[in-house]
């Protein structure tokens, strides 16, 4: 069973699990739904509901739609980069279908990975894991896929972290260092903080490029604009925080910080856990749900995109993993015409935090220093930079959810439960953490639960 099927099965199991034992709510055909959050999860839920004739109102705390999807344009160069979600995977069927529906073009966004380690540069194809580990790793992935879901052996993976699992399976120190550098970019923190279940499932079920396949032409925010238009911009309320959600008399009332309130038959809350915990829930959330919210952490990621006066790297499909502070680089302007180009540094965890404390010039210096073993002195080509540190984002305090050991099969399932007439959605409940596809799936699943309730 793929992770997507696991989510659907778990969702079915808990869809009717109203976790308010002392309250009874009569069955109503929903006519109005309030959605908290106008990121891609909330917009996807709203779009599905509107297609079924349900009135929707989206309430968004930010001054824009899109949440963690944020395209930035260097206007004078007519070039774009992503400060948030970056990739559309070859396996991301729903997002690909939406792009087709809205007439959005997907462009190849695959790369060939160079390596800088110990100040030594190796081109793509000139480095790899040891043959012994490649063979062992493939057998581990195959074994995981052969296990029956829910079996004791498969569930055991959630008792270890990803780092420990590989150590226990004989990975060498050199291979382990490479895996840490590479895999931590997928999870946003060290692999010592990742459930082995989440870790091995990530790679056992991915496309050959680990879902780093496509990008939306013109920027990923294009899908946000299309969804918002389809839902109706008049149904989206920006710059408004939800303070309280109260369930009574068979309906739900949402109270906002501007004094306004909205009543509906159902609510879908798509906020990350940090913002969700700031809402006053009446009746209150159960203890197991609160415990799960407090357990789940989010990754610290900073993306720093530098506009260079020329594409000195020559290779349009360049990306590079390094053991330096800027960590991972990729060519943001692949398939964008122009002499100028953008390289983006993607740093995680402590690296991200340290970079976030630097001014823009210092960030540029660190990035150019990291690139020196491969390209020499390139600071002379750097014009300016833009960055976003998700670790201090006012509404998320992180980029995306990271499931540690003992959390993949426990915390996530708990957080997928509804709270009376309130349903929850978002990237943190999805099978593909950190991908737009997962957020869409989660939003649509919540909408389907309401439609079928």
Across the structure, where does each feature detected by a protein language model lie?
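FAD-dinucleotide binding site
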Residues: 2-453
